[in-house]
Regions:
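HTH-adjacent hinge/linker in prokaryotic transcriptional regulators
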Residues: 28, 32-83
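Short, solvent-exposed amphipathic alpha-helical segments in soluble enzyme
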Residues: 99-103, 162-165
Length: 220
């Protein structure tokens, strides 16, 4: 199966569908059931899954195991992905200890920091290495993805080091945008911005719109 180019909003919903499918108790699932668990409507589910070439069977629904395989292949989750965390402050500590990564096909295998008092610690079962060893450890452990949780001032230098070491995907939690070459995927996660967006949807909810209605009205 080739990797299809999907709308960004559809990509964002696929992991939610996976979560609902993981909780399914039968071998098939209807678009209505999948929609209820994902917080969207059934028409949206059918549209999203049609992008994968999956149309279900009228009166039966979707084969759960097959749909899980389709979504995992589209997301590149057919095997465990090795992850590194750069910056072991409060957020880095929390992410290193988060147990939900493993259940979704991600394994944190490396952690890095510049603080001598943090280097050498075990966090979430992973040894914190000095930043100077980043390239060596990344290559040795086959890391493909990185979580960037450094201060803003050092985020770009850390991203540059990750790219040079061969990391091809970066999830940036630092409060500063980082640049990377076209062959490297970067997603920026600014928690302050997320709170601002949440405030907007809070106003919509207070006005009587559901979260889905608010998103739909915004053109997603």
């Amino acid at each position: 199966m080739s990797i299809r180019r999907l709308p960004e909003a559809t990509v964002a919903r696929l992991p939610v569908y996976l979560r609902v499918l993981a909780e399914a108790t039968e071998g098939t699932i209807s678009s209505e059931h999948l929609a209820a668990g994902a917080g969207v409507n059934a028409a949206q589910v059918r549209k999203d899954l049609s992008h994968l070439g999956s149309y279900g069977t009228r009166g039966v629904g979707y084969d759960v195991a097959y749909l899980v395989r389709q979504i995992n292949r589209q997301l590149g989750l057919t095997a465990d992905r090795r992850v590194a965390i750069v910056g072991i402050g409060n957020l880095g500590h929390a992410l290193a200890r988060y147990g939900g990564f493993a259940t979704r096909g991600f394994r944190v295998v490396a952690a890095f920091d510049v603080d001598p008092s943090t280097v050498g610690q075990q966090v979430g079962g992973v040894l914190v290495e000095p930043f100077e060893r980043l390239a060596e450890v990344i290559e040795g452990k086959g890391v493909e993805l990185a979580l960037l949780t450094t201060p803003a001032a050092s985020a770009q230098a850390a991203a540059d080091a990750l790219v040079a070491a061969g990391v091809n995907s970066i999830l940036n939690f630092a409060p500063a945008r980082v640049a990377a070459p076209p062959h490297v995927a970067v997603r920026q996660v600014d928690l302050g911005v997320e709170l601002q967006i949440l405030c907007y949807y809070g106003l919509q909810a207070a006005a009587g719109l559901t979260a889905y209605d608010a998103v739909d009205a915004a053109g997603s």
